[in-house]
Amino acid sequence: MTALALSRIHFPITTLGPGKRVGVWFQGCSIRCPGCVSMDTWAAGKGMTTVADVLDTLAPVVSSADGLTISGGEPFEQSEALAALLRGWHRLGGGDVLVYSGRALEDLARALSELDGLIDAVIADPFLRAVPQTVALRGSDNQRLVTLTTRGVELFSAYEAPLPVGERALDVLFDDNTGDAFLVGIPRPGDMVKLAAALKAAGHSAAATEDVR
Ligand code: SF4
């Protein structure tokens, strides 16, 4: 039974890859990019579950999902769980796979070769707060989108273009059990801070992870 530290799962998400996707956020990241908007995923050892349990959760929605996006946290810090999850996803008949990593692309070469055929596209390199953000799917323009399969080329090449102004979007998702709301997607610099301030002014409890770009 392969252990996995999990932050959350959402379906459907529409802002991190093509179509209606399953989003899986790994818990734990030691990279600690200044300005990261996912600081809640940094702590290791939280959200312990198993890959089998995650696949049981995903199974009912696989046929409705166009693809899977794995983010975090740093998925490659749980390489065994990542590989098991990807194999399970494909056993279930799941669609394309996009994986985010804060590691440099060069440092992922060995891991990606071991996962050959299981990932269609990867977005690599750390988030850099001082670098502009104009390209789709990336938090900062230094991050590289690499297609790894024929399907990846077909589905993700279009994302190399700059994101047109007015086409930025975030998914808003609610946790029915806790009442929490999550925003999914790539916010513009300062968006999270502005949103938290607006919600607080309206009398809601709101917290934003650090984003002082
Ligand atoms: S941006 Fe990604 S890699 Fe960087 S600290 Fe945040 S979760 Fe980790």
Residue ranges and their predicted role:
Residues 165-213:
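Charged phosphate-binding loop/patch that engages nucleotide di/tri-phosphates or the phosphate backbone
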Residues 101, 149, 185:
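Short beta-strand/turn micro-motifs composed of small residues
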Residues 2-7, 20, 38-99, 103-114:
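Conserved Radical SAM active-site core
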Residues 120:
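Receiver (REC) domain switch/active-site residues of two-component response regulators
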Residues 101-102, 125-127:
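Short secondary-structure boundary segments
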Residues 78-87, 132-179:
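P-loop/Walker A phosphate-binding loop and immediately adjacent motor/lid segment at beta-alpha junctions
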Residues 1-25, 30, 34, 38-44, ...:
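N-terminal [4Fe-4S]-dependent radical SAM core
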